């Protein structure tokens, strides 16, 4: 879009992603308003950043594009009660994750364009890369193209975030939602956490010191993941010893075997057919009893107390811990 036809944007939510999106878009020349609850946890932050902050119902009224950047589980009610009744005819509705739309929890008005733009990095990185003249890759999708310009809206928004400086890849709401959930559950969060805890337990139960076990299965994981991030699995293998490489080749498949892969497929099936989302909605509506139980169990796992003591002596982590003190999750509007 040319400068004189750039959409007026309303950002609903001001958590990690919301703040980065709002700041980058404003610095890219867009007219950005932030919609938040009066007295909400991030209202003062948005105001301190120089934004006009109004109620979400007001923010969306004159916006050409409304970006919903609040947690997944509040979006349905927010859309039905606040956004849908107030969005102007023919505007564009944008999501950073497709869960609610793909699984029909949000059914957008027929007159709206509906798109998705998701930077592939946390909000702090999205902002930092933009400020130094680079960008974080973005994926985008079009769910509903009423105006014939939905894709243009998505690409314009992604460009405003800095995504065009890096890479922009087209996807679908289905693909983004299902692969994102699978990655979180089977590998990045659920898979990695369970693997680390199991490895710690095996070593401690075999009589090794918990502190040594912590270093071997958790602390050093960052070194490996950083190499993955920089150049893939083969780069990691280039930087470890031949002994470690051989152990990778012969023991990795013993831990992650065909049975593990089959169970990963089961996880994917539950995501694809909506079982996971149905269960998650029911859990949330019930007040999170199992969620809280699982969370407490993780907090009480022996690796946490050991790690807390060891990290207290890692003085180089102090600045990182302070930066991480703010909630990583996006805040409700």
From Swiss-Prot:
Active site residues per record: 97
Residues that hold substrate according to the record: 241
Domain KARI N-terminal Rossmann: 1-171
Binding sites annotated in the UniProt record for NADP(+): 14-17, 37, 42, 72-75, 123
GO molecular-function term, one example from the UniProt record: ketol-acid reductoisomerase activity
Class in the EC hierarchy, top level: oxidoreductase
This protein's pathway: Amino-acid biosynthesis; L-isoleucine biosynthesis; L-isoleucine from 2-oxobutanoate: step 2/4; Amino-acid biosynthesis; L-valine biosynthesis; L-valine from pyruvate: step 2/4
Function: Involved in the biosynthesis of branched-chain amino acids (BCAA). Catalyzes an alkyl-migration followed by a ketol-acid reduction of (S)-2-acetolactate (S2AL) to yield (R)-2,3-dihydroxy-isovalerate. In the isomerase reaction, S2AL is rearranged via a Mg-dependent methyl migration to produce 3-hydroxy-3-methyl-2-ketobutyrate (HMKB). In the reductase reaction, this 2-ketoacid undergoes a metal-dependent reduction by NADPH to yield (R)-2,3-dihydroxy-isovalerate.
PANTHER family: KETOL-ACID REDUCTOISOMERASE, MITOCHONDRIAL
This protein's name: Ketol-acid reductoisomerase (NADP(+))
Annotated organism of origin: Xanthomonas euvesicatoria pv. vesicatoria (strain 85-10)
Underlying gene: ilvC
């Amino acid at each position: 879009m040319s400068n004189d036809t750039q959409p007026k944007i309303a950002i609903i939510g001001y958590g990690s992603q919301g703040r980065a999106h709002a700041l980058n878009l404003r610095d890219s020349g867009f007219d950005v308003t932030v919609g938040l609850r009066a007295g909400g946890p991030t209202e003062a932050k948005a105001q301190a950043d120089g934004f006009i902050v109004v109620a979400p119902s007001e923010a969306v009224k004159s916006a050409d594009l409304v970006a919903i950047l609040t947690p997944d589980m509040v979006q349905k009610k927010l859309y039905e009660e606040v956004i849908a009744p107030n969005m102007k005819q023919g505007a564009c509705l944008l999501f950073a994750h497709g869960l609610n739309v793909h699984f029909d929890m949000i059914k957008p008005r027929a007159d709206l364009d509906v798109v998705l733009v998701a930077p592939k990095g946390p909000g702090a990185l999205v902002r930092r890369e933009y400020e130094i003249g680079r960008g974080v890759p973005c994926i985008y999708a079009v769910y509903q193209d009423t105006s014939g310009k939905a894709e243009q809206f998505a690409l314009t928004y992604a460009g405003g975030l800095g995504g065009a400086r890096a890479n922009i890849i087209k996807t679908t709401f289905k693909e983004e939602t299902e692969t994102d959930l699978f990655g979180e559950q089977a590998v990045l969060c659920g898979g990695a956490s369970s693997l680390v805890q199991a490895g710690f337990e095996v070593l401690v139960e075999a009589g090794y010191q918990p502190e040594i076990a912590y270093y071997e299965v958790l602390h050093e994981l960052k070194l490996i993941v950083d190499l993955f991030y920089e150049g893939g699995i083969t780069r990691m293998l280039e930087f470890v010893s031949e002994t470690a490489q051989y152990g990778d080749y012969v023991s990795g498949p013993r831990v992650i075997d065909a049975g593990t892969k089959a169970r990963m497929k089961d996880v994917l099936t539950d995501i694809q057919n909506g079982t996971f989302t149905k269960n998650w909605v029911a859990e949330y509506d019930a007040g999170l009893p199992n969620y809280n139980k699982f969370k407490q169990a993780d907090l009480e796992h022996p690796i946490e107390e050991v790690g807390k003591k060891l990290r207290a002596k890692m003085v180089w982590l102090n600045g990182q811990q302070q930066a991480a003190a703010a909630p990583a999750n996006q805040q409700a509007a």
